[in-house]
Amino acid sequence: MSWGQALRNYKPTGQQLFFSLTALLAAAVWGRDRQLDIGLFSPQSQLLALGLGFSLAAIAGYWVVPLLRRIKAGQFIREDGPQSHLQKAGTPTMGGIFAIPAGLLPALILAGRSPLVWALAFVTLAYATIGWLDDWQILRHRNNKGISPKLKLCLQFGAAFLFCLWLISQQGWQGTITTITLPFGWSLALSLLFWPLAVFTLVSESNATNLTDGLDGLAGGTGAAVLAGLGLWLAPQDPAIATFCCSLAGGFLGFLLHNRNPARVFMGDTGSLALGGAIAAIAIVANCLWVLLVMGGLFVLESISVILQVSYYKATKGPDGKGKRLLRMAPWHHHLELGGWSETQVVASFYGLTLLLIASCWLLN
């Protein structure tokens, strides 16, 4: 039997995926703490941060999800999407309102002495607020259209610009982070060009995670894995930022308890934009953009699939105004769904891909 056939025959449940991912990430974080000789109840313990974030989000979900259902904060499903998704209509959305605070609070308690941790928390909340505005407009107008794309993009650029201004005030225009580190000991001095790259990274990453948030447990699980991976990477040299990473990873794992297939709640733009904004901001302040590019390769793949789909459709548009599609549907996860993959098969594959990409960073280093 080929690998492809074996994968197609593997049909895990959402519960199995949740427990497997949570156990694997917790074991990896525990191992890193042991390697660095950090006790469980030390403020620098990444396992403590992960556990607190997880516990707060998991507990909060049992209160917030029924509340969202009572106020009729149900998701509107796109009619041109996979038909199997129509049954999800009415599932509460905006779950980021409990996942994000639950992930940030332990970080601020354990590592709040670091100004960088507060800056990361603020930029995460800024993107969560932009997402909340979009979610609220969708619920208010009872359709799948939130704030206008132009306004949304302007707000994303505004938040990125303000964050970069703060960094400039701390480090100057040509601070140490403007020379970005690369694999194999290489580096690249960008000087002033670093700042447009930083703004672009924040905006593009927040949109990439937003595009990835299309299946039960997909964005939450892969996002938690990337955050935990960044925490493991940064623990020796930047313990405060690593604590932030693991705390937020715990928040998304706790959210995943309620978002695993079949989902009781969706994170909405409130969670997905905040997730991407946080991951990008971490990579910027910790000077590990190449690590983000590799660990977050799935988010890049999802974004590229949309760009290629739109570009190909426009390039092949005929006199009737209709073009050809490169994929069955974009993003990539919907293409696989329409090819006969179940949701959990796609999610399991993407979890595996993300974990492999995270592991590959140590090989590249």
Curated annotation (Swiss-Prot):
Reaction equation(s) it catalyzes: UDP-N-acetyl-alpha-D-muramoyl-L-alanyl-gamma-D-glutamyl-meso-2,6-diaminopimeloyl-D-alanyl-D-alanine + di-trans,octa-cis-undecaprenyl phosphate = di-trans,octa-cis-undecaprenyl diphospho-N-acetyl-alpha-D-muramoyl-L-alanyl-D-glutamyl-meso-2,6-diaminopimeloyl-D-alanyl-D-alanine + UMP
Subcellular location as annotated: Cell inner membrane
Enzyme's top EC category: transferase
Keywords: Cell cycle, Cell division, Cell inner membrane, Cell membrane, Cell shape, Cell wall biogenesis/degradation, Magnesium, Membrane, Metal-binding, Peptidoglycan synthesis, Transferase, Transmembrane, Transmembrane helix
GO cellular component terms, semicolon-separated: plasma membrane
Residues that span the membrane, as ranges: 47-67, 92-112, 114-134, 153-173, 180-200, 215-235, 239-259, 281-301, 344-364
Pathway: Cell wall biogenesis; peptidoglycan biosynthesis
Keyword Transmembrane: yes
Membrane topology reported for the UniProt record: Multi-pass membrane protein
Cofactor: Mg(2+)
Domain of life: Bacteria
Catalytic activity, EC: 2.7.8.13
Molecular function terms, GO-annotated: metal ion binding; phospho-N-acetylmuramoyl-pentapeptide-transferase activity; UDP-N-acetylmuramoyl-L-alanyl-D-glutamyl-meso-2,6-diaminopimelyl-D-alanyl-D-alanine:undecaprenyl-phosphate transferase activity
UniProt KW Transmembrane helix keyword: yes
Record-linked InterPro entries: Glycosyl_transferase_4, PNAcMuramoyl-5peptid_Trfase, PNAcMuramoyl-5peptid_Trfase_CS
Gene Ontology terms describing biological process: cell division; cell wall organization; peptidoglycan biosynthetic process; regulation of cell shape
Function: Catalyzes the initial step of the lipid cycle reactions in the biosynthesis of the cell wall peptidoglycan: transfers peptidoglycan precursor phospho-MurNAc-pentapeptide from UDP-MurNAc-pentapeptide onto the lipid carrier undecaprenyl phosphate, yielding undecaprenyl-pyrophosphoryl-MurNAc-pentapeptide, known as lipid I.
Protein family: Belongs to the glycosyltransferase 4 family. MraY subfamily.
Name listed for the protein in its UniProt record: Phospho-N-acetylmuramoyl-pentapeptide-transferase
Organism, scientific name: Synechococcus elongatus (strain ATCC 33912 / PCC 7942 / FACHB-805) (Anacystis nidulans R2)
